[in-house]
């Protein structure tokens, strides 16, 4: 499937699903974020944001997904879905095709940036006899499921580099790993912020498999060159040169003066924005390691920040926290008399 056809299918899906978004207006508005697979970085970032919201007495449902394309679709059409994590190359190619294709232009209308996040490394786990990216020619390569950012990135990279595998298989990374280990695949792509749980929590034999270096001038001109530090994974003792793509938190341009669904969603977006700004140090300390690499000023070109996000970042904005303050323990009568006497003598 070509990139244009993939984006057109996305656009048609948005049009077909418009009634679903409208249905959310008649329900109690909840908050949710579209993330990724159970072993990916996106879902851990989503859980960190939910923890942040819970400190304010609110909740953010963390929804598993195929990845970037499904997440973009979810923000546009899924009821009670205010956020989705999306790869910046997905956004870039949507912008490219939007100028020539009205359906794609309609698909991206109303979608906004909430926050830029971090660089995601393109992991390609391969047999050790496959030494370079060019060696994927004629091999059996899994590129992720169709609605994932991994699928789009892998497809673009192979096309840009002129690499033609013997087979490109739409298999999720979590399913591809055992197939690689069984000899049914030669390599598979996985775009995820390191350290990715898939590699850190599974036994991978370094004598059979390695992360493929990606040193290709064409790809390095399109993507960000990156170095995966040695020891990031147990099977990977040495640094690996590869490329990366930025992850971005997307939202929708909810109207704060619109219907009740838009008003409530805008409040939720503003609340999370305010909490993220004031809690970024806590996220960097207690959340996924990728929070330490987040640059909140690195906005992808061609996209605007949501009005509701900017409202939440206003120093005067107060998030709608509903969690009651902890109750002060009540003194017994004897302790109360003691405190009064101490305060009278020493001052309190």
Enumerate the language-model features and the residues they cover.
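Sec/Tat signal peptide C-region and signal peptidase I cleavage site
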Residues: 20-26
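Pocket-flanking alpha-helical
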Residues: 46, 62-104, 176-179, 195-203
